[in-house]
């Protein structure tokens, strides 16, 4: 079996629970075809670089998969049909990364570190800019 990184973008107007349901459906398809799902990173609702089907934001989900090509073909076929999925991309990789992805672990615009279910974001703090010589 081959190793893949699969990412999909779900519409902004569905609930986060529906994103988890979509993920579980696709996990089931992969397991039906004899594959395994590794690490899952749910990046949450993020802005898009440009509008896709009148959406300015989307739920980003990254999944590490160890499965045969037939499983990937079936998942992509079902994603093409599902209107809640805006975009998807599957890339074959040599090995899965042990650490979190670079996008997930980088600082966001507000200076917060990316978060997951085990380590939620801390509440935002007021930023106080101090200018030397000005009181």
Swiss-Prot record:
One of its GO terms (molecular function) is small ribosomal subunit rRNA binding. Residues 104-135 are annotated as: Disordered. SUPFAM superfamilies: Ribosomal protein S6. It comes from the Bacteria. GO terms for cellular component: cytosolic small ribosomal subunit. The keyword Transmembrane helix does not apply. One of its GO terms (biological process) is translation. Keywords: Ribonucleoprotein, Ribosomal protein, RNA-binding, rRNA-binding. It holds the Pfam family Ribosomal_S6. InterPro entries: Ribosomal_bS6 (IPR000529), Ribosomal_bS6_sf (IPR035980), Ribosomal_S6_plastid/chlpt (IPR020814), Transl_elong_EF1B/ribsomal_bS6 (IPR014717). Signal peptide: none annotated. Binds together with bS18 to 16S ribosomal RNA. Belongs to the bacterial ribosomal protein bS6 family. This is Small ribosomal subunit protein bS6. It comes from Bartonella henselae (strain ATCC 49882 / DSM 28221 / CCUG 30454 / Houston 1) (Rochalimaea henselae).
């Amino acid at each position: 079996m081959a190793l893949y990184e699969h990412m999909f973008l779900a519409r902004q107007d569905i609930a986060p629970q529906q994103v988890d349901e979509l993920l579980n459906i696709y996990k089931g398809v992969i397991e039906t075809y004899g594959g395994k799902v590794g690490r899952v990173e749910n990046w949450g609702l993020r802005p898009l670089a440009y509008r896709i089907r009148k959406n300015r934001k989307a739920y980003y989900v990254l999944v590490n998969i160890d499965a045969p090509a037939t499983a990937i073909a079936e998942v992509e076929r079902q994603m093409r049909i599902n209107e809640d999925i805006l975009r998807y991309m599957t890339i074959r990789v040599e090995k899965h990364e042990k650490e979190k992805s670079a996008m997930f672990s980088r600082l966001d615009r507000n200076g917060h570190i990316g978060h997951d279910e085990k380590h939620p974001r801390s509440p935002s703090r007021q930023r106080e800019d101090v200018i030397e010589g000005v009181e």
